[in-house]
């Protein structure tokens, strides 16, 4: 990303970061704040509206000025239009302000990151212990589950980036059949797991994580006994 910033500065090209997911999650300043990179424009959503409908675009003052209204009819006819269903929605704005005050504290991200690392490590330990092909990986407070695949750095620990794995596997994850079966098995254990992974938050506790890992183990053992890992799906 640093090299991309250098390239765009040399060519006079705008650098746009999509921080809809990473914004305020990787750090209070998103990925750009964590890495010390300042893009020209940034898209944000989800957290920025406190969980209510809404999104935001931020960027350099000279670029953002192209959106503003002025006391100039000719300018207002030429300005970049910015229509939106939730523009100036007071409810989303109030929720967003309250939420942003919370996530401005780096302790929020540190806690969510720690819970995600605990979950990834626990799930990988289950996979290694029972000899089930698969790995759980992710950065920050995100986790991805890839059953039916192997990576060379699976040692039952937290995996930030799996090694020896095709980029296609990282993109698509496990097969739809395995994903659906795992989801159903986890629901039977009392855990509503998002298909293929999920995201942790400041609300999750170590007890939540440990109970999820225990449910994951029971679900996988049942799937193994039913023959789900006897062949590549």
Task: Describe the role of every protein-language-model region.
Residues 1-233:
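Conserved N-terminal phosphate-binding loop of PLP-dependent enzymes in the Aspartate aminotransferase
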């Amino acid at each position: 990303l640093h090299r991309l910033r250098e390239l765009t500065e040399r060519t006079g090209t705008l650098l746009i970061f999509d921080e809809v997911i990473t914004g305020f999650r990787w750090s209070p300043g998103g990925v750009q704040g964590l890495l010390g990179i300042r893009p020209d424009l940034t898209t944000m959503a989800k957290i920025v509206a406190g969980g209510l409908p809404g999104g935001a675009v931020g960027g350099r003052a000279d670029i953002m000025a192209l959106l503003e209204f002025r006391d100039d009819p000719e300018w207002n006819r030429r300005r970049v239009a910015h229509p939106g269903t939730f523009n100036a929605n007071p409810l989303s704005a109030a929720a967003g302000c309250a939420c942003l005050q919370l996530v401005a504290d780096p302790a929020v991200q540190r806690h969510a990151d720690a819970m995600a690392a605990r979950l990834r490590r626990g799930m990988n330990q289950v996979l290694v212990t029972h000899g089930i092909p698969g790995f759980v990986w992710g950065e920050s407070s995100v986790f991805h589950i890839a059953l039916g695949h192997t990576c060379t750095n699976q040692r039952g620990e937290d995996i930030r980036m799996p090694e020896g794995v095709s980029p296609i596997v990282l993109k698509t994850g496990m097969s739809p059949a395995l994903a659906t079966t795992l989801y159903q098995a986890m629901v039977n254990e009392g855990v509503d797991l998002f298909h293929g992974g999920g995201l942790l938050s400041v609300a999750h506790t170590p007890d939540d994580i440990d109970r999820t890992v225990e449910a994951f183990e029971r679900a996988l053992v049942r799937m193994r006994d039913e023959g789900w890992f006897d062949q590549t799906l």
